């Protein structure tokens, strides 16, 4: 089985903790986009940018 993160996920920088694999691991939505993301709003930014901020869903 995949290491840890099966029932409880520890999110870090938008992904599961190092060494963990978990499809349900999601961090809180970003508050704002980074300078590298040219989107109208944070919803579009989350959809189109690979990693607009420190913690993305």
UniProtKB/Swiss-Prot annotation:
For whether the record's keyword set contains Metal-binding, the answer is: yes
Return the SUPFAM superfamilies for the record. Answer: Metallothionein
**Stretch list, region Beta:** 1-28
Record: residues binding a divalent metal cation 6: 39, 45, 49, 56
Tell me a Gene Ontology molecular-function term this record carries.
Answer: metal ion binding
Listed binding positions for a divalent metal cation 5 are 33, 37, 55-56
Region of interest called Alpha, as start-end residue ranges on this chain: 29-57
The residues the record assigns to binding a divalent metal cation 2 are 5, 9, 22, 25
Enumerate the InterPro entries for this protein: Metalthion_crustacean, Metalthion_dom_sf
| Ligand binding (a divalent metal cation 4) | 30, 33, 49, 53
Record-listed a divalent metal cation 3 binding positions:
11, 16, 25, 27
The entry assigns this protein to a family as follows: Belongs to the metallothionein superfamily. Type 3 family.
Its annotated function is as follows:
Metallothioneins have a high content of cysteine residues that bind various heavy metals. Class I MTS in marine crustacea are involved in the sequestration of elevated levels of heavy-metal ions.
Q: What is this protein called?
A: Metallothionein-2
The species is: Scylla serrata
């Amino acid at each position: 089985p995949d290491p840890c993160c099966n029932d409880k996920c520890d999110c870090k920088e938008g992904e599961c903790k190092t060494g963990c694999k978990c499809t349900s691991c999601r961090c809180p939505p970003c508050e704002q986009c980074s300078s590298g993301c040219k989107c109208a709003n944070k919803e579009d930014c989350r959809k189109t940018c690979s990693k607009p901020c420190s913690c993305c869903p």
